[in-house]
A protein has these predicted regions:
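A short, basic/flexible loop-to-alpha-helix module at the beginning of a structural domain
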Residues: 1-13, 67, 107-109, 323-324, ...
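Nucleotide phosphate-binding/pyrophosphate-handling subdomain across enzymes
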Residues: 2-3, 10-18, 26, 33-37, ...
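Phosphate-binding loop of NTP-binding sites
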Residues: 8-10, 33-39, 53-56, 70, ...
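Conserved N-terminal Rossmann-fold NAD(P)-binding element of oxidoreductases
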Residues: 17-22, 442
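Short internal beta-strands
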Residues: 39-46, 219-224, 360-364, 385-395
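Beta-strand->loop->alpha-helix junctions that form or flank phosphate-binding loops
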Residues: 44-45, 63-66, 101-108, 147, ...
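Glycine-rich, highly charged phosphate/nucleotide-binding loops
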Residues: 56-72
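C-terminal helical cap/extension that packs against the catalytic core
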Residues: 379-435
Length: 459
């Protein structure tokens, strides 16, 4: 039995929960939270790893490899979108009459376990903003729970099971998964032309964000400078507070200054009064918006401006968000999750401002549909670095599309380098990078492995 419709008593009626693919970063926070709430958790995965080791230390019974025996005696089975429909454990659960639930649906149930669920949405900036809000609440002693799309060093992982009343959740719009949540407070950072292979049009994408906003129980926080976001907000009969730089939001960054190359500070104006000063410890003008969202939510939740400023000053970034890996031939090697042209532009412009002699970008295009649909935008943005190294497209969930290739992309970018593998990309950097360069790997696939190869000789 696949659980899709909401049943408010679902988690009241189960005790033993089994997670297929328990080593995944998306599963781990849910396992932490449910284990802390007293559920008997088991799991399985095909490979060992740091997450599985952490789960075992928590007392979770983890089996390496999938077997029908793993689900015997459990009350519910959780699976992610990455699990094949013919998975032996999923089929066994079906034959035994054990309810099965997809990870994003379970996350919706988990969001209802807390008095205040703070759900952060937007095409860009979700992980950073979710991490900033979690950092602020954590440093303020609120002990929040969290489910984040990247690793936050402060909490040593992708989430945590706190004892407080708050849970901070990264709300992803892919395949409408954020519509399974029940936000008490919600954030809409921006709405951009991504996942149109699923939605079909910007109109449908904006309608999904409208539905998400309408599900918010108390207050919506929206980016006043993002036209698509405000197009949605103007159609709502809901309580909305806004933040921005250019427009007069309820929370506004004024007197914005670059205190060192690529790093910004600003005065926080709440309505008509400057209430404090915020200095960011992460580079990039785009992070001002993420910090404003954090300030807006946390001020509403009862934190002081000083506590927000402390969080901004102490937050050094989340995993795979302009994360420094080390050096290669004296060049600094950084990895970033950017995979949409808007994100690439923000990240590359930030990198340009840092004062390095050359910027080398190693980009792994992600999905054929996105690469084809936004081809001209990718071409334009990949002209920003001094050298663009292009790897093969990572198709992920999509079948191969011979009409779109990395070679076609590279052919439109003067001076670009086309490689056939991550290993070849790393080798090219090892042979050509030099002191004074900044090398940045870009993409939401496994491009980070190339960064690790580049710095391996220096570790």
């Amino acid at each position: 039995m696949f659980i899709t419709d909401y049943n408010q008593h679902l988690l009241d009626n189960v005790k033993k929960i089994h997670f297929i693919g328990c080593g995944g970063s998306g599963m781990y926070p849910l396992i932490q939270i449910l284990a802390a709430k007293g559920y008997d958790i088991s799991g399985s995965d095909v490979l060992d790893g740091s997450i599985i080791r952490s789960e075992r230390e928590m007392g979770v019974k983890v089996s390496l490899g999938h077997s029908a025996d793993n689900v015997i005696g459990v009350d519910m089975v959780v699976y992610s979108a990455a699990i094949a429909k013919d998975n032996v454990e999923l089929n066994a659960a079906s034959s035994y009459g054990i309810p099965t639930i997809e990870r994003s649906v379970l996350l919706g149930y988990v969001s209802r376990l807390y008095r205040e669920s703070i759900c952060v949405s937007g095409t860009h900036g979700k992980t950073t903003t979710t991490s900033m809000i979690t950092t602020a609440l954590e440093l303020a002693g609120r002990d929040p729970s969290a489910v984040i799309g990247g690793k936050l060093p402060l909490i040593h992982g992708y989430g945590k099971a706190g004892k407080g009343d708050d849970i901070v959740i990264e709300a992803c719009e892919f395949a409408e998964t954020f519509l399974k949540l029940t936000p008490y407070l919600s954030v809409v950072l921006n709405i951009d032309n991504d996942h149109l292979d699923y939605y079909g049009s910007m109109g449908e994408l904006k309608f999904a964000f409208k539905r998400f906003a309408l599900m918010t129980q108390f207050m919506i926080f929206a980016n006043a400078d993002d036209k698509n976001t405000m197009d949605v907000m103007y159609t709502l009969d809901r309580r909305v507070r806004t933040f921005g730089i250019e427009n007069d939001g309820d929370y506004q960054a004024v007197n914005v200054q670059e205190y060192k190359p690529g790093f910004f500070e600003f005065d926080l104006k709440e309505w008509s009064k400057v209430t404090g000063h915020i200095r960011l410890a992460v580079p990039g003008r785009h992070n001002i918006y993420n910090a404003l969202a954090m300030c807006a939510v946390c001020r509403f939740a009862g934190l002081t401006v000083e506590q927000c400023a402390e969080a901004a000053a102490s937050f050094k970034g989340a995993g795979r968000r302009f994360e420094v890996y080390g050096e290669c031939n004296g060049a600094v090697v950084v990895d970033d999750y950017a995979h949409h042209p808007t994100e690439l532009r923000a990240t590359l412009n930030t990198a340009k401002e840092l004062g390095y002699k050359r910027l080398i970008a190693v980009h792994q295009p992600f999905t054929y549909s996105r690469t084809k649909m936004l081809f001209n935008d990718f071409v334009d943005v990949l002209k920003i670095p001094d050298i663009a190294v292009i790897t093969p497209i990572m198709g992920s969930r999509e079948p191969n599309d011979p009409t779109i290739t990395s070679a076609k992309l590279a052919a439109q970018i003067p001076g670009s380098v086309l490689v056939n593998s991550l290993e070849e990309a790393a080798d090219w950097v090892k042979q050509n990078a030099r002191e004074g360069d900044l090398v940045i790997t870009l993409g939401c696939g496994d491009i980070y492995k190339a960064s690790k190869m580049m710095v391996a000789d220096n570790q």
